Protein backbone atom coordinates (compact mmCIF):
# COMPACT_ATOMS: atom_id res chain seq x y z
CA UNK A 1 0.00 0.00 0.00
CA UNK A 2 1.20 3.51 -0.75
CA UNK A 3 1.78 6.10 1.93
CA UNK A 4 -1.13 8.50 2.20
CA UNK A 5 -0.38 12.19 2.65
CA UNK A 6 -2.61 12.84 5.66
CA UNK A 7 -2.56 16.52 6.56
CA UNK A 8 -1.73 17.25 10.19
CA UNK A 9 -4.91 19.34 10.62
CA UNK A 10 -7.29 16.71 9.20
CA UNK A 11 -10.23 16.32 11.58
CA UNK A 12 -11.97 13.27 10.14
CA UNK A 13 -10.88 10.45 7.88
CA UNK A 14 -13.61 9.76 5.34
CA UNK A 15 -11.81 6.74 3.90
CA UNK A 16 -8.64 5.27 2.40
CA UNK A 17 -8.95 4.08 -1.20
CA UNK A 18 -5.81 2.28 -2.36
CA UNK A 19 -3.16 5.03 -2.70
CA UNK A 20 -5.58 7.90 -2.01
CA UNK A 21 -7.17 9.13 1.20
CA UNK A 22 -10.27 11.29 1.68
CA UNK A 23 -10.46 13.68 4.64
CA UNK A 24 -12.78 16.34 6.06
CA UNK A 25 -11.86 19.42 8.08
CA UNK A 26 -14.74 20.84 10.13
CA UNK A 27 -13.68 24.49 10.32
CA UNK A 28 -13.55 25.80 7.73
CA UNK A 29 -15.59 23.02 6.14
CA UNK A 30 -13.51 21.43 3.40
CA UNK A 31 -12.98 17.92 2.12
CA UNK A 32 -10.19 16.57 -0.03
CA UNK A 33 -8.74 13.51 -1.68
CA UNK A 34 -4.96 13.39 -1.31
CA UNK A 35 -1.98 11.17 -2.22
CA UNK A 36 1.80 11.18 -2.21
CA UNK A 37 3.69 10.49 -5.41
CA UNK A 38 4.83 6.92 -6.01
CA UNK A 39 7.96 8.45 -7.53
CA UNK A 40 9.17 11.90 -6.49
CA UNK A 41 11.83 13.66 -8.49
CA UNK A 42 12.71 16.11 -5.76
CA UNK A 43 13.98 16.32 -2.22
CA UNK A 44 10.63 16.15 -0.42
CA UNK A 45 7.67 13.91 -1.08
CA UNK A 46 5.06 16.46 -2.17
CA UNK A 47 1.40 15.58 -2.69
CA UNK A 48 -1.55 15.97 -5.02
CA UNK A 49 -5.01 16.83 -3.73
CA UNK A 50 -8.47 17.47 -5.10
CA UNK A 51 -10.47 19.62 -2.67
CA UNK A 52 -14.04 20.76 -2.18
CA UNK A 53 -14.57 23.96 -0.16
CA UNK A 54 -18.32 24.69 -0.01
CA UNK A 55 -18.00 28.23 1.45
CA UNK A 56 -15.52 29.21 -1.29
CA UNK A 57 -17.64 27.69 -4.03
CA UNK A 58 -14.88 25.25 -5.00
CA UNK A 59 -15.70 21.71 -6.05
CA UNK A 60 -13.03 19.16 -7.02
CA UNK A 61 -10.23 21.73 -7.26
CA UNK A 62 -6.69 20.43 -7.94
CA UNK A 63 -3.66 21.43 -5.86
CA UNK A 64 -0.19 19.91 -6.23
CA UNK A 65 2.72 20.41 -3.81
CA UNK A 66 5.82 19.78 -5.91
CA UNK A 67 8.61 17.58 -4.54
CA UNK A 68 11.14 20.35 -5.06
CA UNK A 69 11.10 24.08 -5.64
CA UNK A 70 10.77 24.92 -9.29
CA UNK A 71 12.56 27.53 -11.35
CA UNK A 72 9.97 30.30 -11.54
CA UNK A 73 10.73 30.92 -15.22
CA UNK A 74 9.75 27.34 -16.11
CA UNK A 75 6.24 25.98 -16.52
CA UNK A 76 4.59 23.06 -14.76
CA UNK A 77 2.86 20.39 -16.85
CA UNK A 78 0.48 17.73 -15.58
CA UNK A 79 0.01 14.68 -17.83
CA UNK A 80 -2.63 11.95 -17.60
CA UNK A 81 -2.45 9.48 -20.48
CA UNK A 82 -2.39 11.52 -23.70
CA UNK A 83 -3.78 14.67 -22.02
CA UNK A 84 -1.40 17.46 -21.03
CA UNK A 85 -2.37 20.43 -18.87
CA UNK A 86 -0.37 23.58 -18.10
CA UNK A 87 -0.68 24.45 -14.41
CA UNK A 88 -0.36 27.81 -12.66
CA UNK A 89 2.42 27.69 -10.08
CA UNK A 90 4.56 29.47 -7.55
CA UNK A 91 7.72 27.96 -6.06
CA UNK A 92 6.35 24.72 -4.58
CA UNK A 93 2.63 24.76 -5.36
CA UNK A 94 0.73 24.28 -8.62
CA UNK A 95 -2.96 24.30 -9.50
CA UNK A 96 -5.37 24.47 -12.42
CA UNK A 97 -5.87 27.98 -13.76
CA UNK A 98 -9.67 27.90 -13.75
CA UNK A 99 -12.74 25.74 -13.05
CA UNK A 100 -12.99 24.29 -16.59
CA UNK A 101 -9.34 23.15 -16.33
CA UNK A 102 -10.06 21.60 -12.91
CA UNK A 103 -12.99 19.68 -14.41
CA UNK A 104 -10.92 18.46 -17.37
CA UNK A 105 -8.04 17.35 -15.12
CA UNK A 106 -10.32 15.52 -12.69
CA UNK A 107 -12.12 13.81 -15.60
CA UNK A 108 -8.75 12.65 -16.96
CA UNK A 109 -7.70 11.45 -13.49
CA UNK A 110 -10.87 9.36 -13.20
CA UNK A 111 -10.03 7.34 -16.31
CA UNK A 112 -6.23 7.34 -16.05
CA UNK A 113 -3.80 4.87 -14.51
CA UNK A 114 -1.12 7.38 -13.57
CA UNK A 115 -0.47 11.10 -13.53
CA UNK A 116 2.84 12.93 -13.82
CA UNK A 117 3.73 16.48 -12.89
CA UNK A 118 6.83 17.84 -14.63
CA UNK A 119 8.82 20.98 -13.90
CA UNK A 120 12.35 22.34 -13.88
CA UNK A 121 13.91 22.82 -10.48
CA UNK A 122 15.93 25.74 -9.22
CA UNK A 123 19.33 25.25 -10.84
CA UNK A 124 17.88 24.01 -14.13
CA UNK A 125 17.46 20.29 -13.43
CA UNK A 126 14.15 18.83 -14.68
CA UNK A 127 12.13 16.63 -12.33
CA UNK A 128 8.90 14.65 -12.42
CA UNK A 129 6.53 13.48 -9.69
CA UNK A 130 4.42 10.44 -10.61
CA UNK A 131 1.11 9.50 -8.97
CA UNK A 132 -0.81 6.22 -9.20
CA UNK A 133 -4.48 6.96 -9.84
CA UNK A 134 -5.93 3.71 -8.45
CA UNK A 135 -8.47 4.81 -5.86
CA UNK A 136 -8.38 8.48 -6.91
CA UNK A 137 -11.90 8.58 -8.38
CA UNK A 138 -13.42 6.94 -5.30
CA UNK A 139 -11.51 9.25 -2.94
CA UNK A 140 -12.55 12.33 -4.95
CA UNK A 141 -16.20 11.22 -4.87
CA UNK A 142 -16.00 10.52 -1.13
CA UNK A 143 -14.53 14.00 -0.52
CA UNK A 144 -17.26 15.69 -2.58
CA UNK A 145 -19.96 13.73 -0.73
CA UNK A 146 -18.28 14.44 2.61
CA UNK A 147 -18.85 18.16 2.10
CA UNK A 148 -22.16 17.99 0.26
CA UNK A 149 -24.02 19.33 3.27
CA UNK A 150 -21.63 21.95 4.34
Each language-model region and where it sits:
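N-terminal signal peptide c-region/cleavage motif recognized by signal peptidases
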Residues: 5-7
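A generic "folded-domain core" signal
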Residues: 9-150
Amino acid sequence: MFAIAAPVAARDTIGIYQGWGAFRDASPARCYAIARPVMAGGRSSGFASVATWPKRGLRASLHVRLSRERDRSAGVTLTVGERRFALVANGLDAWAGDAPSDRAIVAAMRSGRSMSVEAVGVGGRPFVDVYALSGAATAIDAAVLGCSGG
